[in-house]
């Protein structure tokens, strides 16, 4: 499966090739929302790989179908809160708080483990916490350091957008989310969607690590997803026996 397609088809193919895969091997492409940094590569992917099926929130799915002909049966709308079967997994969408008509995170449930993804949200809601609670591993957003953003070169309107409840999570907000998830049993976290302009991996990791340790969750594994290259994550049940 591929989550979002915000990069070019060439980069998608290069990334898959590092895993000895091609786009033809994809069972599904999951789309979280319609911003270009999440869908820019989708038109070319769908044009050249006719067997690729896309799963997206309803508003995004309908927009994709209107934008291009010949996609009937290849775009699958996922109503928020409902689940669909994908081979040996169950995919569930939950709403995030972002400045688009509709944006979602996903939880993928297999036979023995659950994996969640939650980025592009300006705040954390009870519904999001409920969806991610007890996941064995999750990717969560640590988009910006507030001081870097405020002192940076972004125009005022963009800073306000990012800092709003429909923008992106700061390192501090991410730390609060991490602790809340740790209380539900989540034991492996990956920080993602870091701004190149307004954050640094070390800043994000330190903010979240200190918060987790301060709340007694030093056993939680914490990693930062790189902007380039791979991060391999093995998702295993938290309660797996030795």
Language model: regions and residue ranges:
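Cap/insert and terminal regions of metallo-dependent hydrolase folds
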Residues: 126-224
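Conserved beta-strand hairpin/beta-sheet module of binuclear metal-dependent hydrolase folds
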Residues: 1-19, 104-120, 137
């Amino acid at each position: 499966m591929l989550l979002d397609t915000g990069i070019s088809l060439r980069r998608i193919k290069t990334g898959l090739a590092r895993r000895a895969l091609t786009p033809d091997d994809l069972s599904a492409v999951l789309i979280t929302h319609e911003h270009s940094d999440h869908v820019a590569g989708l038109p070319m992917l769908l044009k050249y790989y006719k067997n690729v099926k896309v799963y997206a929130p309803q508003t995004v799915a309908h927009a994709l179908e209107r934008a291009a002909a010949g996609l009937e049966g290849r775009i699958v709308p996922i109503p928020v809160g409902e689940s669909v079967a994908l081979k040996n997994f169950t995919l569930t969408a939950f709403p995030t708080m972002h400045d688009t008509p509709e944006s979602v995170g996903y939880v993928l449930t297999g036979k023995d483990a659950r994996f969640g993804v939650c980025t592009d949200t300006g705040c954390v809601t009870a519904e999001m916490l409920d969806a991610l609670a007890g996941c064995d591993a999750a990717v969560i957003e640590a988009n910006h350091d507030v001081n870097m953003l405020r002192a940076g070169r972004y125009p005022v309107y963009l800073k306000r957008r990012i800092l709003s409840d429909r923008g992106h999570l700061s390192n501090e907000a991410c730390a609060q989310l991490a602790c809340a998830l740790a209380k539900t049993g989540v034991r492996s976290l990956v920080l993602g969607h870091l701004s190149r302009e307004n954050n640094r991996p070390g800043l994000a990791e330190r903010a979240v690590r200190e918060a987790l340790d301060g709340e007694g969750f030093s056993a939680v594994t914490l990693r930062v997803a790189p902007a380039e290259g791979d991060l391999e994550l093995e998702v295993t049940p938290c309660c797996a026996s030795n």
